[in-house]
Curated annotation (Swiss-Prot):
Belongs to the universal ribosomal protein uL18 family. It comes from the Archaea. It comes from Haloferax mediterranei (strain ATCC 33500 / DSM 1411 / JCM 8866 / NBRC 14739 / NCIMB 2177 / R-4). This is Large ribosomal subunit protein uL18. InterPro entries: Rbsml_uL18_euk.
Amino acid sequence: MATGPRYKVPMRRRREVRTDYHQRLRLLKSGKPRLVARVSNKHVRAQLVTPGPQGDETHAAATSADLDEYGWEAPTGNLPSAYLTGYLAGIRALAAGVEEAVLDIGLNTATPGNKVFAVQEGAIDAGLEIPHNDAVLADWDRNRGVHIAEYAEQLDEPLYSGDFDATNLPEHFDEVLGNLQEDE
């Protein structure tokens, strides 16, 4: 371990690989609420957050587990569920009076077409004003899950035996999106 007067121990949340303080400061200087998008292998979370003296204040939040209320039966860690989670977070943010935000992807890599940008696209389609570059957003077929359905069709039947038939994912996506739009 490095020692000496020039050695500086990183802040705890940076050591735990949880917070990029340089990025956080840039986002806070914008003065807009942050759309915090966090993804895991099983779920997607989206929150609209503003900084406060006692800590960050959450104005609206949605997780992919909330999609069950709207009829979502597919797994909750994929790209279509990320889009729908962003859409749901956008609806809830507009209901809470938040109309604009900036995307906070945390320590995720900014790969075009990934799940954090699907969350952003869902929130934009719900009506939030979020500055973005269209080059990072996935095409509509990918948001609907056409790529997952095509892959599921190629699999042998014994290898593919789940509770949900992924070959019907695009139609299921359209159905759940319609349910979300009805509840706006």
